[in-house]
């Protein structure tokens, strides 16, 4: 796989073929016999897949812009993001022409001989506070139809779906009378998508620095974990991979041994935290001085972990602190500069790369 943009300066078919060959997550190009992989005892359905790299993404376009303008150092940094397969986010924001856009991504993946990963974010689960309803019955109906529409658009195509990040962890953000509605809505979405014959699905399960495993496991059973491959962790958080493995194994034993995947797109330096009432509180909203984590792979540290995947979008700012959800090149460059393959803090380094957090670690997008 190229580590410098200079080695990818030839844009012909041979260069593209070599690049895509290097993106295979396994030496074998074959897919599992059962793409759904519902039984925990079935082979890892991600093993041997080549995942889609979107050459229309902001990261890829940024790399090309730096390359064209001769900014070699920045191009080499952004290439660390652009070259990796990352999830494609779908939601109410995927408009207009939702079906056309989804089919275009699926067709582009097929042209690469690859499989797209979709992070589905359609449920109203981004707010929090007194009186927050998380939508309405009418909005729930629109979301149910959206799930069904997505299922029709995907059809028989091979895909991986990361279903509704944060939707369980933020359940208590809703007013009590709406919480069961959220669970019913998620269950209906799981039911619609789990019927897809060639979709490997992982459900939202928070992160190791969030809800207790017993509570998350109960919610997973309610929304239909038995119908899909497993669950996902750390999609919007930054906690260490090793911590998420421990947390995930605790959840897994409570849901019949279901496998899981971990988002490692932004946890190469771990979380930024502070102490409050003798508890460690991790900052999830655009912490500074974070780094890319282990690249996507099915070669993980535990057999119950199907893969480390980049389910989030490094270089984007999350929609908080008054900032829109958007691509910020300085933030992307920062992630790339501080990239590591660490799964836990190295010995002698309390917070990854420094003993104390500098003030900038608590800042907004950098």
Predicted regions: what they are:
Residues 23-41:
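C-terminal region of N-terminal signal peptides and the immediate post-cleavage residues
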Residues 120-123, 162-167:
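Short glycine-enriched loops at secondary-structure junctions
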Residues 46-149, 153, 313-337, 346, ...:
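N-terminal carbohydrate-binding/catalytic regions of secreted carbohydrate-active enzymes
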Residues 13-26:
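Bacterial N-terminal signal peptides
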Residues 2-15:
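Bacterial N-terminal signal peptides that target proteins for export
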Residues 53-78, 208-337:
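Surface-exposed substrate-engagement region within the catalytic domains
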Residues 115-117, 158-162, 198-202, 228-232, ...:
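Structural preference for beta-strand elements that scaffold enzyme active sites
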Residues 133-158, 165-199, 207, 211-215:
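Active-site cleft segment of glycoside hydrolase catalytic domains centered on the general acid/base Glu
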């Amino acid at each position: 796989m190229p580590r410098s943009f200079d080695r990818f300066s030839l844009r012909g078919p041979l260069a593209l073929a070599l690049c895509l060959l290097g993106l295979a997550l396994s030496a074998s190009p074959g897919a599992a016999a059962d793409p759904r992989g519902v039984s925990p005892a079935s082979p890892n359905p991600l093993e041997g897949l080549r995942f889609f790299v979107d050459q229309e993404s902001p990261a890829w376009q940024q790399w090309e812009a730096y390359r064209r303008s001769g900014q070699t150092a920045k191009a080499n940094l952004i290439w660390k993001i652009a070259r990796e397969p990352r999830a494609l986010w779908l939601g109410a924001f995927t408009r207009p022409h939702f079906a056309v856009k989804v089919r275009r991504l699926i067709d582009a993946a097929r042209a690469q001989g690859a499989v797209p990963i979709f992070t589905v974010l359609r449920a109203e689960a981004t707010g929090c506070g007194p009186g927050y309803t998380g939508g309405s019955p009418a909005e729930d109906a629109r979301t149910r139809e959206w799930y069904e529409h997505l299922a029709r658009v995907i059809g028989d195509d091979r895909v991986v779906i990361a279903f509704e990040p944060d939707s369980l962890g933020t359940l208590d953000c809703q007013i009590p009378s709406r919480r069961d509605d959220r669970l019913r809505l998620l269950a209906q979405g799981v039911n619609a998508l789990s019927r897809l014959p060639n979709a490997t699905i992982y459900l939202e399960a928070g992160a190791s620095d969030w809800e207790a495993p017993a509570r998350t496991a109960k919610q997973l059973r309610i929304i239909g974990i038995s119908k899909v491959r497993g669950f996902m962790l750390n999609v919007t958080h930054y906690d260490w991979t090793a911590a998420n493995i421990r947390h995930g194994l605790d959840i897994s034993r409570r849901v019949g041994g279901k496998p899981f995947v971990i988002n490692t797109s932004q946890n190469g330096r771990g979380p930024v935290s502070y102490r409050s009432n003798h508890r460690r509180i991790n900052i999830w909203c655009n912490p500074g001085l974070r780094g890319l984590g282990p690249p996507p792979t099915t070669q993980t540290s535990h057999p119950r972990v199907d893969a480390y995947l980049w389910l989030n979008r490094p270089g984007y700012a999350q929609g908080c602190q008054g900032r829109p959800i958007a691509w910020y090149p300085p933030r992307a460059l920062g992630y790339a500069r501080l990239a590591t393959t660490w799964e836990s803090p190295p010995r002698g380094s309390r917070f990854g790369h420094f003993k104390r957090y500098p003030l900038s670690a608590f800042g907004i997008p950098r």
